[in-house]
Amino acid sequence: LETRKDLDRDGRRKVLESLLQEFHISHIRDNLGMSLSGGERRRVEIARALATAPKFILLDEPFAGVDPISVGDIKQIIHHLKAKGIGVLITDHNVRETLDICETAYIVNDGRLIAEGDAETILANELVKEVYLGHEFRLXPGTRLKYWQTALKLRVKLLLYSRQTLQFKAXNLLDLALRRPRVVDGACAPANKVLSPC
């Protein structure tokens, strides 16, 4: 917050209190970072990034080293960021969790776009299975997934513009655009449901 020259001391304090409340981290405000759980650490990292009022945020492996409940919390935070009009770029090896929050995916291999579509389309693509996922990968609930030891990374690039409409652009390996929320009477419908575009 010290970098926010547009805010005086009281303004910075108000932003701090607002972020602590928004991310449910008021109770850990005086704790050392090493004493936080993985999920608490992720929420603090995201709140810190939002203190600068960004238009775009990078989440580097947000699903790594956190328990399943925290994974759900992080997904909700990602949907919350999108609803606030903040673009999100995610790099993560957790294919299951990342595909679960996307609407459209682009797979690029050796600098060439080899597939695009929703999660089911990507998972059914034989070339994607051959070069990236393997033939055992499944996205069904309760299925134990095999995570392949590769240097590949997932990338989510999301550009928000004009009333929740998304524009997609392929980056290095896999670009995912998050689900678009439906606007109902000026408020967003629940982001955890697949909805038609606005």
UniProtKB/Swiss-Prot annotation:
Record's bilayer topology term: Peripheral membrane protein
Locations listed in the record: Cytoplasm; Cell inner membrane
Keyword Nucleotide-binding in annotation: yes
Lineage per the UniProt record: Bacteria, Pseudomonadati, Pseudomonadota, Gammaproteobacteria, Pseudomonadales
Originating gene: lptB
Name of the featured protein: Lipopolysaccharide export system ATP-binding protein LptB
Similarity comment: Belongs to the ABC transporter superfamily. Outer membrane lipopolysaccharide export (TC 1.B.42) family.
SUPFAM superfamilies: P-loop containing nucleoside triphosphate hydrolases
This protein's record includes keyword Manganese: no
Signal peptide: none
Pfam family, one: BCA_ABC_TP_C
Main location: cytoplasm
Functional note: Part of the ABC transporter complex LptBFG involved in the translocation of lipopolysaccharide (LPS) from the inner membrane to the outer membrane. Probably responsible for energy coupling to the transport system.
PANTHER family noted in UniProt: CONSERVED COMPONENT OF ABC TRANSPORTER FOR NATURAL AMINO ACIDS-RELATED, LIPOPOLYSACCHARIDE EXPORT SYSTEM ATP-BINDING PROTEIN LPTB
This protein's GO CC annotations: cytoplasm; plasma membrane
Protein keywords: ATP-binding, Cell inner membrane, Cell membrane, Cytoplasm, Membrane, Nucleotide-binding, Translocase, Transport
UniProt EC number: 7.5.2.-
